[in-house]
A protein has these predicted regions:
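Structural preference for long, well-ordered alpha-helical segments in enzyme cores
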Residues: 12-13, 42-46, 55-67, 119-127, ...
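Acyl-thioester-dependent condensation/acyltransferase catalytic cores
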Residues: 1-54, 61, 65-68
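Conserved residues at beta->alpha junctions
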Residues: 46, 114, 297, 301
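Non-catalytic, low-complexity flexible loops and terminal extensions
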Residues: 38, 50-125, 313-320
Length: 320
């Protein structure tokens, strides 16, 4: 618990993101409370083997329900994504390393901005008119802003890793588990697409991510990698090949429950904040709370002005 009224949530989140979990020491979960007289901040972090970003949002809901006097029942252990999808689940046939010394990365920088409810509504309306998702619109803003600032982004193909929620496909509601599948938007260097043309391109690039064929293929690839008893070097190369996108962008969508819990109210939510251990990586998180779109940027080597640039591109595209 941190009781200092001057504690900054950005610094605390950065330290949590930078603190590794020991895989064989449960629980693979941590919680931090920044407490003040009339406000408090919960920071929930976990190993990705335990749950995903949506799960942590539901856990935060349960914490607020408990604090407001609701009795909560214990839930059964959720089956794995593989079991729910009916896919063959394979594991390694050799024990893992007893320890592995990895160099600690630089402390990341975390920052956030939020649009007003009016600006968020304008963005939603314009995206609907253009036939694209909010995720696609933010991806376009991210691309334009990043390439305006960073020469490497301008002169190289841009890969945007975009994890997609598949709870509805798996028949899930608020279970605490991993229920995402990987997607990626690939944008060649150069080009002269307008903002909304770029947004439509991004939407098309993710159109098949939630198909049963793609989910099955992704699960099979993951299981094959795990069951092949990779060496440390092989695992490192696999991570570089699969997760080496310049940016990971996760949109958790609209808060799936009311933000008022008796005398308590959830005012803001900055999520998700995660790192992959890739050189130069940028992570963008998005979630809409109380009608306001919240954007969070996390990186050990942040592109200066990226988040402000994204906000500005969204404003220009929607005339807000």
């Amino acid at each position: 618990m941190v009781t200092s009224p001057f504690a900054r949530w950005q610094r605390e989140i950065a330290e949590e993101v930078n603190e590794p979990f020991t895989p064989d020491q449960a629980p693979l979960f941590r919680a931090v409370l920044l407490h003040q007289e009339t406000h408090c901040i919960f920071i929930l972090s976990s190993h990705h083997a335990v749950c995903d970003g949506s799960s942590r949002i539901f856990l935060l809901r349960d914490i607020l329900l408990a604090l407001s006097g609701h009795a909560l029942e214990a839930l059964p252990l959720a089956p794995s994504r593989e079991n729910l999808f009916g896919a063959q689940q394979r594991t390694s046939t050799e024990p893992g390393l007893p320890s592995f010394a990895a160099q600690r990365p630089l402390l990341p920088r975390v920052e956030g901005v939020k649009l007003t409810p009016q600006q968020t509504m304008a963005l939603q309306g314009r995206a609907r008119e253009e036939g694209v998702t909010i995720h696609a619109a933010i991806s376009a803003a991210l691309t334009i802003a990043g390439r305006a600032i960073d020469e490497n982004w301008r002169n190289s193909p841009l890969r945007i890793m975009s994890p997609a929620e598949i709870r509805n496909i798996l028949g899930l509601k608020d279970q605490c588990m991993v229920s995402v599948v990987g997607g990626e938007i690939f944008i060649a260097s150069g080009g002269s697409m307008t903002f909304w043309e770029l947004a439509r391109f991004a939407k098309d690039g993710l159109s098949a991510v939630k198909s049963r064929e793609n989910i099955s293929r992704k699960i099979d690839l993951h299981c094959t990698a795990v069951s092949s008893n990779l060496t440390v070097e092989q695992a490192f190369q696999l991570k570089r090949n699969v997760f080496n996108a310049q940016v990971m962008f996760t949109n958790l969508g609209r808060l799936p429950f009311d933000s008022t819990f008796g005398p308590l109210k959830l005012e803001t939510l900055w999520a998700p904040c995660a790192l992959r251990g890739i050189e130069g990586e940028q992570t963008l998180g998005a979630v809409t709370v109380n009608g306001s779109l919240h954007l969070t940027h996390t990186s050990p080597a942040p592109i200066p002005g990226l988040l402000a640039g994204i906000e500005e591109e969204l404003r220009k595209a929607c005339a807000i």
